[in-house]
Amino acid sequence: MTQETLKADIKALLKERNAVLLAHNYMRDEVQEIADITGDSLALSIEAAKTDAEVIVFCGVHFMAESASILAPEKTVLLPRLDAGCPMADMVSVEALREMKAKLPGVPVVTYVNSSAAVKAESDICCTSANAVKVVQSMSEKEIIFAPDRNLGSYIARFTDKKFHLWEGYCPTHERLRPEVVKELKQANPDAPFVCHPECNPKVVELADHVCSTTGMYDYCKKSGAKRFIIGTEAGILWRLKRENPDKEFILASPALICPNMKLTSLEDVFEALQQMKPVVKVPEDIRIPAKRALDRMLAIPRD
């Protein structure tokens, strides 16, 4: 079966199943190309919550499909690759988070959406990289527990006088980008702004001309007068950046910026998931209800 035939078959199955295909910005190019909606975690969470489709095919990693199930329990949520996990999400367990909460009674937990449903259920509010600063600024408490990403937490702490108790988690892919590599690239390309994701190491973030979520990168690069950019996030973002800005050049800050989990999902996987209507991700009600409370609090914060 050719790729074009496969794409046509997927489109036909999507229609037949009354399904919507959501793809994260880090997916393979060909998967993003057939998606009904591409976006970051926040954008896709919002789409999952409001879609009229009966079936959500989530091309991303496990915690994203869980979020869709939490927000739209009446929908069937398919995750084409059940083994597409997130190492950072796995760095925080419910038991360990409960221990931290017990040591810091009354301190609210802000959890990055890159976490399991069970961890979200232990949290007061969730955030994404797109709204994390706003979420923390909306809180009246003077101290917060922030999990699981220490790098995102360090970045948000710059914009508030709150005391942060940071979980020691991180994204292995973003952590691979080293400051010395960025310095060399900036020296070699002085006309190119360095745009990076807040999941990068703080020493890398310090070198950035602009720090933002993947959606923020699309907006920034589109509006900027610059013609060349150094991009500090997962390689999958380049597909849409190049498509939306054909007259601009994008330099990936490092060839190491590839997430193996995000690259697992193929067109064949999407086709099989739709054909067989599995694997299904369904969050149990005892976890879903408290997790939804944390996500709803996040979604209630006004967007720009």
Swiss-Prot record:
Its main location: cytoplasm. InterPro entries: NadA, NadA_sf, Quinolinate_synth_type2. GO terms for cellular component: cytosol. Iminosuccinate binds at H24, S41, Y112, V113, N114, S129, H197, P198, E199, T214. It is an enzyme of class 2 (transferase). [4Fe-4S] cluster binds at C86, C171, C259. Keywords: 4Fe-4S, Cytoplasm, Iron, Iron-sulfur, Metal-binding, Pyridine nucleotide biosynthesis, Transferase. Its EC number is 2.5.1.72. It is found in: Cytoplasm. One of its GO terms (molecular function) is metal ion binding. It catalyses: iminosuccinate + dihydroxyacetone phosphate = quinolinate + phosphate + 2 H2O + H(+). Binds 1 [4Fe-4S] cluster per subunit. One of its GO terms (biological process) is 'de novo' NAD biosynthetic process from L-aspartate. It holds the Pfam family NadA. The keyword 4Fe-4S applies. Pathway: Cofactor biosynthesis; NAD(+) biosynthesis; quinolinate from iminoaspartate: step 1/1. It comes from the Bacteria. Catalyzes the condensation of iminoaspartate with dihydroxyacetone phosphate to form quinolinate. HAMAP family: NadA_type2 (MF_00568). Belongs to the quinolinate synthase family. Type 2 subfamily. This is Quinolinate synthase. It comes from Citrifermentans bemidjiense (strain ATCC BAA-1014 / DSM 16622 / JCM 12645 / Bem) (Geobacter bemidjiensis). The gene is nadA.
